[in-house]
Amino acid sequence: MRRLAACVFALSLMLAALGSRPVTATPLTEEQQTAVARRVEIYLRYLFAWGPETGVKVTSMHESAIPGLYSAIVEVNQGERRGQEVVLVSADGRYLVRGDFHDTTEDPFAEVRQTVVLAGHPSKGPADAPVIIVEYGDFQCATCAELYPTMKKLLAERKDVRLVYKDLPLTRIHDWAMAAAVAGQCAFRQSPDAFWRLHDFLFENQKQITKDNLDVRLDALAPLLELRLEEFRTCRTQEATRATVEQSLREATELGLRNTPSLFINARPLAGAQSYDAILHLIEYELYLQKQGSAPR
C-alpha cells in the first residue's frame, strides 16, 4: 500500500510539473486505445526481453480510480506459462505505473549506459561486438567462480560478444578479494592477456587460496604469466592501483549493486550465476532488437 501511495504521489508531482490538473479521465477512442496498447507492449517487451516467441497483449483499458490514468491488463503467454498484470497508463501511453514509475519515451537502461565506464578495463572479444557484457566480479566470490565456466564457454562459442570485467570486491565478507583485484589490475597494466590468465587461475584455484598464501602464489605465478616480478610486486602495494579498484567500487555503488556477480548485457541487468541459456537468451534478444531497430528511445 505504501509503495502504491508513493507511485501515485510521484505521478501527481509529474502531472503537476507538466502543467496538468488531475481531472477525470475521458474514455479513450478505439484508435487511442490501440495506440496506447501498442506503445505499452513495445516498452514492456524491451524492458523484460520478451522476443517474438512471447505473446504480449494489452487489454481491458478503462478509467481507473486515479484521475488522468487508465487501468489496463497486460497478458503474457510463454508456451504453457501464462500470466497477467494490471498496470496504470496515461492517456498518451507515455507514463506507465507497475510498482515503479516508467517513462515509456525513455530508455530504462540509460542510467547504466551513462554510468558504466568501459575504457581502460580488461575486455575479451571483438572490439566491435554488437553485444557487450559487463561483469562486476569478486575473485573470492564462490558464485562468481560458478559463473566463470559459463562465461568462458560463451566467449569461446560466440564471436558477437565482448566481455568487460570490472572489480567489485566484497571486502566486508572476503578477506583477500581486494588484494586479488589489485593484483588483477597490476597484471592488466603489463599485459591484457596476463590479466585474463590470472583471472582464470584465481577462479579455478579459489578454494586453495587464502589471505595468507595469496602473495606467495601470485609471485610464483608471475613468471608463468610473463610478468616482470618486481614491477608486479611494487604495483600491488601502490595506492594508485588500489584507487582504480575503488573507482570501480564507487561505480557499482552508484548502480545499486550489492552482490556479485552482477552482469549487464548491453546495459540490461542480470544478477547471480545465471545459466548459459539465460545469458544466451538476452544476447539473442539484443541481436534481435538491433536487427529490428525497435528499442524505444
Regions found by a protein language model. Name each.
Residues T26-R98, D219-R297:
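C-terminal cap of thioredoxin/glutaredoxin-like
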